[in-house]
Amino acid sequence: MNKKSLPLMALRDIVVFPGVIAPVFVGRQKSLHALSNTTLSEEDNSKYILVTLQKKFDQENPNRNELYDVGILAKVIQIVKLPNTTAKILVEAIARVKISNIKGDEAFEANYEIIPDEEIFDANNMRSLVDNAVQLFAKYAGSDKKINAEIIETINKEISETSNFINIINILASHLITSLEEKQRLLEETSPFKRISTIINILTSNIVNSETEQALQQRVKKQIEKTQRDYYLHEQMKAIQKELDEDKSDLAEFDKKIKAAKLSKEAREKAEAELKKLRTMNQMSAESGVTRNYLETLLSLPWGKYDNSKIDINQAEKILNRDHFGLEKVKERIIEYLAVLQRSSKIRGPILCLIGPPGVGKTSLIKSIAEGMGRKYTKFALGGVRDEAEIRGHRKTYLGSMPGKILTQLKKVKTSNPVMLLDEIDKMGSDFRGDPASALLEVLDPEQNSHFVDHYLEVEYDLSNVIFIATANSYNLPRALIDRMEIIDISGYMEEEKIQIAKNYLVPKQLKMHKIKKDEITISDDAILDLIRYYTKESGVRSLEREIGALTRKALKQILADKKVKHISVDSNNLEEFLGARKYNFGLAEKNDQIGSTTGLAYTEVGGELLTIEALSFPGKGEIKTTGKLGDVMKESAMAAYSCFRSRAADFGLKYEDYKDFDVHIHVPAGAIPKDGPSAGCALFTTIVSLMTKIPVRRTVAMTGEVTLRGNVLPIGGLKEKLLAASRGGIKTVLIPEENVKDLKDIPPNIKSSLEIIPVSNIDQVLEHALTKKT
């Protein structure tokens, strides 16, 4: 075909199909110019124009690259100019065309070439597809309320007036409710079969969506009608009850409870006011539910209810000794506390706080205290608590509000004088929701807790009869909180104590738990000692109990699997057969006296340990280097020890030239374990002196103590645990600070008898006992 040129107009929101007459609103300048450039055709004295869809709807002035290259050759049937410089035109789409060579600035003009439809070879198949599409369109138009009835009638008329399949397809396509991009793809498609198939798919999808939307609307309508009906029936029932003057049983029950409860004057007035308010409320309202919950909570608290406890310190002492081995000083302090309570029902002394590592029996001690006092026991776990409302409660204006855990626990035990454990008090945090530690100050202060006000209750509640006892693993507590409590340290158990606990408590408990008779298994003391040393590493006995449990299960399995086995004996020789290879090792003394290697003593959260400190020297700048994952305090101890050595080098027969060009590298194995603290000063100094003087350190000597720059030895902590580690590791002599001699009275006699304990006050005394010869 010959190419021709015509004005081109970009359409924003409509795709016109061949054979369809469509109205077009023209408002953009380029479109108006293109319309004015149309001229009368010589053939039929009509105006023709090219129209095509722009690719982006919101593009105000699209360029030639932003127009689709397949459009329509249209005849302008009518032009109506509107007052606001716009126009409305009526166009008849003549044919689909390929647009090319677009040009022009004020108005587009382009060449075009008509694109014919492909020939229809199977008329019968096409007829059935077209009929199917027409039926689907009628069904969709009938189900979708968005399509006007007049439009449906017009479309049906257009379809009935033509027998041309292509025209029917174009009429259906022009009235489809789908995206402009989808319509443009239909226009560009030259195959009638593909076009009608796409139309059928779109209509089918639209029908499914329409039916789904209608079903959803119907369900929503029914739900609204049901809600309105229920509300009407409730209101009608209330009106009938009011006419009959019937009492509301639940409100009458509240009234009885208020009269029967031993409420304080303030609480009674508050309860009566809330009940009066509840009587006038709509029972279906949200506020009614809030008020009802408040009254239920207020009346469920144990107002004026106390256990008739009678403290007998002799009986309490028996209970403590029955449930706990060792811990003599701790039990003595608890008995003193109970003795004061026996004489005075209202104690104004400090709150007890038991501080010690996990598994040493802090929680079970408090249970025994409650039993010894004849009071109920309750627990408030503070670990991870960050919200102040956990202590003081939420104000009842908030959705889902409730009282704090203090009052919740009292409600649970139904008494106002229980023993309440504040567990893991050192694990509390604080964030934007408040500081629970500060909220606890009021609870733990004997001068204030008789007037404790929970935010939810909004009335005072007397907590002065509650015995609060806290537990913690460390001293990481706010200063103000520590001031309100008396700290009782619970150190870890000695090996001998663990053996007795295992024999008298843990083994019988596990045998009973696993239904094993005493004559079916025997665990020797040596096996228990190996369990403690090689399968656990703790201050308490929790892991020990787990290992004993594993041991008894293995034994039970053997007994049940082999009927010939009637008794199993476990000792140190066959322990690994039950529990596998050893998990831990403890430090042992060196096999030989070493130069530049000293045995120190460390105190960790799992007990005492031998700490090997070694050093090397090599050419350098006279500097000191430390490795072994040492903390800041221990690094500073090493620097202080090195400075002390350099100031005394002449006393050891060394000249400045002997060490000024040498670096000292101090290492503390194992390198992966963090270490910190000042008590390694003596060992660090001895290591440096031994290295520089080439005098070995006695392998049977261990030491602990902090060293000052002037060579004085300062006291340390954890002496009992350190001496136990020394005795266990084959150490014969231990050097301790002279100021720690007072602590030796707390050391078990068997430990003191196995060691030569030498007090030292300065570094000269340390070197005298530690080095194999005098410097």
From Swiss-Prot:
The active site is at S679, K722. ATP binds at G356, P357, P358, G359, V360, G361, K362, T363. ATP-dependent serine protease that mediates the selective degradation of mutant and abnormal proteins as well as certain short-lived regulatory proteins. Required for cellular homeostasis and for survival from DNA damage and developmental changes induced by stress. Degrades polypeptides processively to yield small peptide fragments that are 5 to 10 amino acids long. Binds to DNA in a double-stranded, site-specific manner. GO terms for biological process: cellular response to heat; protein quality control for misfolded or incompletely synthesized proteins. The keyword tRNA processing does not apply. This is Lon protease. Residues 592-773 form the Lon proteolytic domain. Residues 6-207 form the Lon N-terminal domain.
